Amino acid sequence: MANEEQGSILKALDVAKTQWYHVTAVVVSGMGFFTDSYDLFVISLITKLLGRIYYQVPGSSSPGSLPDGISAAVSGVAFAGTFIGQIFFGCLGDKLGRKRVYGLTLLIMTICSICSGLSLGRDPKTVMVTLCFFRFWLGFGIGGDYPLSATIMSEYSNKRTRGAFIAAVFGMQGIGILAAGAVSLLVSAVFESKFPSRAYILDGAASTVPQADYVWRIILMVGALPALLTYYWRMKMPETARYTALVSKNAEQAALDMTKVLNVDIEASAAKNDQARVSSDEFGLFSMKFLRRHGLHLLGTASTWFLLDIAFYSQNLFQKDIFTTIGWLPSAKTMNAIQELYMIAKAQTIIACCSTVPGYFFTVGFIDYMGRKKIQIMGFAMMTIFMLSLAIPYHHWTLPANRIGFVVLYSFTFFFSNFGPNATTFIVPAEIFPARIRSTCHGISAASGKAGAMVGSFGFSALVKALGMSNTLYIMAGINLLGLLLTFTIPETNGKSLEELSGETEPEKIKEKIVV
């Protein structure tokens, strides 16, 4: 039996039951994040291999390694591209619409993933320059996926489960990290079985077989597959009803799009004077009215994301160095080039399975019950505690009998970053800003995070060399504590509609007839 009710498009979105389309949107948007994290984190697995292939010094007592500057560039150049892409595509998503630029980011990621693996030349300089060039543009495409995926998912979702939906999209980052390790394990195992060689300590020249040059290229190019496979479905997604109604001022089209995907019949009857009232309340980005309403919120989302990413990316990108320092990974001399890649990938995969991935999905399960702010405070607090637990008795953890304990505590920092601020810093900016600048503000917040990632990727190894691992861990603990304090500048968004949070429209401003 059909019941006729007066309501709004926006209210219909907020009260809509979870349907198959929501699940489809999570998968399609999430596969972009799967690709993002695979491409960003896989580089940390292959840098040791690149050093052996291109920077081996004949007769040296230790395997070749990338020079510090080149290592930092290879690890961090994608973040520079991501930083620019987040701001550029964030603004474009508000100007042109979410859908119109959503497919472009995926195409850039696909093309540049392939080109990264096809980096030109054989001499070290040429290979590194072309690799960095394509990884910069890969990062540019990845950057666009952050504000667009978050904004699209928040605008599609109902208010009851919105946090879980956005967290599920972001949770694909964990699956991407896991996949990066798994693919590296598989490729290195296959090549090791087909092209075995002796450990470096036994035969330095022969420990890196010529075929190793194919290994890192294949691993990088695999990142193009998930992006390519979901391109068609991403282009089939309609523009979000919130953007169409509130920004494009086309209530009829918004009603039509909603009718197709959410199983409700809507007759749009929004009058022009209603839409004019919405427009009259508009204010520009960084206007005085924006700063009064949302200035502190933007400061909070940007600063907490910046601090989180310093710790998160330095931990991820340099965990191989940390594990080598404490002796959890064997000495590089005792392995050939492909075996070393295998062992690094194995360590990352274990950490991903035991702490990284579970953390993401704890967030999915609890965020709409606990709220965003509590989870973020808890995450920063626990990361601070575990970092101090590693730093204070650092010498204790370096003893052979205690190394597993170090790895366990280190894993907990990953768990609480993902069941904590790594997820919530992505979610909150997609909820608290008006629709007409939502994508831009999310892009600014995310770009602030990537600035932190660049600080982490370029600065972590320098800090360790200058201050030692123990003092560096103290600094990371301090960064997490500061992130906890700045969390109090953001509002709790749990259980509230996007329009209630942004204050951009009243329920009666856009009226439709809904038949359920």
Curated annotation (Swiss-Prot):
One term of GO molecular function: phosphate transmembrane transporter activity
Membrane topology type: Multi-pass membrane protein
UniProt tissue specificity: Expressed in anthers, tapetumand mature pollen and, to a lower extent, in hydathodes and vascular tissues of cotyledons of flowering plants.
UniProt cross-references to Pfam families, sorted A to Z: Sugar_tr
Residue(s) carrying N-acetylalanine: A2
GO cellular component assignments: membrane
Spans through the membrane: 26-46, 72-92, 101-121, 133-153, 163-183, 213-233, 294-314, 350-370, 375-395, 404-424, 443-463, 472-492
Coiled-coil stretches: none
Stretches in topological domain Cytoplasmic: 2-25, 93-100, 154-162, 234-293, 371-374, 425-442, 493-516
NCBIfam families reported in the protein's UniProt record: 2A0109 (TIGR00887)
Note: Although related to the sugar transporter family, it does not transport sugars.
The protein's name: Probable inorganic phosphate transporter 1-6
Taxonomic lineage: Eukaryota, Viridiplantae, Streptophyta, Embryophyta, Tracheophyta
